[in-house]
Amino acid sequence: VDIDGAVDMATTLAVAGNVDFNGDLDVDGTTNLDIVDVDGAVNFAADVTFADGADIITASAGDNNVRVGLTAGDSIADGGNQNTLIGDRAGTAITTGDQNIAIGFEALQTEDAGSRNTAVGSFSLQNLNVDGSTYNTALGYYSGNAITTGVQNTLIGGLSGDVLTDADFNVALGYKTLSADTQGSRSTAVGHEALMTQNFTTATDVFNTGVGFGAGNKITTGIRNTLIGSRSGDAFTDADYNVALGYNALTSDTLGSTSTAIGYSALETQNFTTATNSYNVAVGYTAGTAITTGIKNVVVGGLALDASNTGQENTAIGHQALTADTKGNRNVAVGAGTLVTQNFTTATSVYNVAVGYSTGNAITTGVQNTLIGGLAGDASQTGDANVAVGYLSFSSVATGDNNTAIGTRSMFSNTSGSENTGLGKDALYSNTVGAYNTAVGEGALYNNVDGSNSTAVGRLALYTQDPASAVNMYNVAVGYGAGQLVTTGTQNVLIGGLAGDSLNAANENVALGYSALTADLKGHRSVAIGTATLATQQFGTSTNTYNTAVGYFAGNDITTGVQNTLIGGLAGDALTDADYNVALGISSLGLDTKGNKSVAIGAETLTTQNFTTSTDTFNTAVGYAAGKAVTTGIYNTLIGGRAGDALTDADYNVAIGGAALTSDTLGSESVAVGTSALTAQNFTTATASYNVAVGSNAGAAVTTGIENVLIGGLAGDALTDADYNIAVGKAALT
């Protein structure tokens, strides 16, 4: 059908073929046409329905353009392609711009050569006019209305970004988001009225992000803020570098900068009315919610530090960590419930450190405590300057000060004891009021309750020490099990593995060396220095022993002997219940078991003396090998190297000088004073010689002569078997 004139249809028109109109077409009824070409106006009084797949094609100079609306896209020229323009005056100035979408009254109205813009909503991107690919997107009434030369902005929501001019790279989603800014770039506002008042009048890279109802809605010139959550940061004006994530996070602050608040109401009341770098970090439900002007706090965990208002430089990490404190400064609380009751009502530099579940959870006003480990120091209230490291360490302390507890359950029971150091599992476990103790090693000073001034280093050292009342113990035990059975003994020094490990009520002992004084129970005032020294000494009743043994195995076999002084390797190592002996030198008095009152000074002196029954020997031997062969002789005084070194069962001899009386075995009651005096005398049967020789080599050749008196150097030095001679003077009777 070809029609050149006007056609008015009052009823239905149905045509199976094509209809070409050169004039106008007015239709009041229904028109069903396969194809309609109209050169004039087409007016429909009723609805127009297009079949699926049908197109509206409007003529323009460019290609693939869609124009619907009064003067929509009516300036498109050759080169303006693939534009979709719907609405009166939508894209009406576009000439050569491509791939633009404008939907709405006067949307994208002034753009001519710009491309790839999307404007949906009345007056959206109305004033944009920039050549090139700008990639602006505006969706909503008046969104991006004032943008002239800005690029790559995404604005969604009524009045979103509606006064931006040449700003770039902004994202605004929500009613009136970014609705006051003119030249700020690189902001992201998502949510009703987010970043609503931000306004930069000069080109500025802002980098603000506001996501949530009213997020950052009072910011004017603040930059680089990230605010996510309804009302987050909604009081900020020109604050910078803040992060707020969560409902009401950082909702009161106006000029505080460099804060981080993540969580519901985190840092909710923080408010700096002058420009301040707060450096606060709060992460968790109501974390740091009461902070007003406190600075440099790090808060991570639900309810952490949520009562503090002006506290500074606190670190609280964990649920309810530091939850009650209001004005305390410089605390570190890491772990759920750490320092949960601490509360300083006036500004105080506290310096408490608590790390671990519920560590320090009873502290109220204690300061300078360091507590590390689950439940460490969890009963401490007002104690100061304590250190506790380990699960349940220092777990009962109420008021003790200046304690250090490191290790699981170390100082577990301490209540008021002060100045203690416990290092190791269960060290000082039972201590309550004891003070000035040092325990290093598992179970060291484990049972001590009231004792003070003890030092135990080594596993189980002083394990059972437990005086019945508060007593200054002054015990020192160093080594595995050293003094482990001491209960009420005091002033003992026990150093070495198992040193004094059986002592219980003994006092004032010194044991230094592995197994030194290891068997004694109640002996007092012994000194044992060296491996296994006095190792078998054992007094079952309280006894002042006054034994001193110094050297490897010195006095090793002594059981109940007292007042012995044994110095040197193996010195007196066979003595058992012998008393009042002195042995100084390796192996000196080394074989005797029950001889008493002997003095042996020098290597191998009296080395073979041996009394098997208790005997007062009164032997004195001083010098290398002096009296070396004496076995059961008594009352001998032998002084000098090898003096009387062949005597065996001889008695009452005096030999003073090197090699004096050096050959005799059974002669008794001789006196030889001087080098080599009576050096050859030798009685092979028990004989009272009554010889006296004084002087170098005096009587040097006498062998079996008796009752001679020879005084002077070389006096009678040639006599052999002569008797009853007296020679006085140098070389007399020579």
Language model regions located:
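Fibrous stalk/shaft segments of extracellular and virion attachment machinery
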Residues: 1-50
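Glycine- and small/polar-enriched repetitive beta-structure motifs of secreted/surface proteins
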Residues: 47-734
